[in-house]
């Protein structure tokens, strides 16, 4: 009986082992088939399907290194970095020297700039395999992100020479040169790469990218290489019709060609391509912002509205994009629209946050933008009323009270404020001299300003292909917007500004950003419509760079009389409210630099009325100079200081015979310094 029992157990155990062995042998070929199919799909950049086959292979053979590597690589490409890291670590637990897993895991550490972790992975292997191209490329990528480009280039070039320039090293070298903005060497490297690897679609896409960047600052050369760029992109798309890089740079190509040829259909083609990319990659903010911009230009308002909202949801710290969305919304949407209302609410909230902060002056930018976006909002009106009252903007204060009274005619509080404000206006020098007209429902200012005139050019990007297509124009518009709030500066705007832009565009414009660059040879175009009138004297121009959320602007103020830049300075700010802060600093600096100048409006018995006042920075004890054709005649003291005009008594006898209406009046520089010192 015992022997029979032992035999029975033996046969059962043998059967189980035989079954497991057969199952394993049958499963292994099936797993290999899945891995093979996964690799094929992965080579076609179809990681979403490839990963399913790798996972299927793991179910059949959970120890398969190839299947785990496939899941890790595809997860990385799809942005599932935690899953990718898990499988790379599982591979390295079994095979610590598995180089594809080492380089893959290093790529994840690179995302977090964990350079020490990368060094721990690759340094021991580099000692053992100093000529391994994948390890050297991983090392170069780490050095590249650390900003050690020269070291990375040296190591890749040295190894490339030793190994007779293998394709993967040429590709890496092209990227390193590109990062260093050495576009000539980058092009030579990628050109050599595409000759050795003619079936790599990304190689051709990168080659087209380098060609565009190489010629960005030379519009004529950029135009001449467009056919080569198109051919190179087509080579890439023939190899991989869904290639992301090639499709994206075809958008840039079509935008440039459209602007060169004024071909709207070409821009519509760019719009259709970016439309597809934005849907395939819904978390890519650049795609959404670019689609919104093109939609605005093409009149596709539904698309523009949706994609501005989506882009701001992805990054609400993007100050340039927010300003662009506001410009679009003010121009194209009704006040009650969802986007415009959201933008107005944001500016209102930022104003409240900054109102009593260190940056309280730049907070006024938020208030003014909130007014433009939501002029009928009660809380905005309340804040504007308080602001006008505090800053002495009596006319704006009274006009806002008049509008509020129309809406609430029975409010005694409003009526009392209105009566008191009108009483003060009637006591002002502006009213007595006839420069204020008080009607039942409106106060009109008739003061003529003679303060310095300023034309603001678009700012030029310091880097090729700025992230924001309109950034240069937007920064110029933001500077103009802020300067218009400064009474002592007259900004060229409206019809005259548009006429000048039209003339400048005929002379020169950038075919990608459509910015109009500052050029001394074109400045005569500023006065074309003025004929014998006073010429525009001051020009604001400069460059900008937006990198990692930091807005940096290099500004120059050009004086056409002295034919030189009279001031050049830089300013930068990072993060939320960076745009208002930078723009406020620029405006204040321009206000300080420009002379305080006006003219004699009236000559009276004992005094003269001049077009300078508190708005121009004058104080009661300021001394003014009278000039004619640049020659100083004599000085005068202020007897009554108004908001926009003042009464001045010249300090010499017989002045009545010397002065005439239209003579220049300036606040001397010494007086300004003295005043500042006090």
Where are these regions (language model features)?
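Register position in tetratricopeptide repeats
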Residues: 43-44, 77-78, 107, 111-112, ...
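Canonical tetratricopeptide repeat
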Residues: 70, 104, 138, 172, ...
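Pro/Ala/Gly-rich low-complexity, hydrophilic intrinsically disordered segments
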Residues: 222, 226, 249, 267-269, ...
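Short beta-strand->alpha-helix linker/helix-N-cap micro-motif
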Residues: 449-521, 540, 603
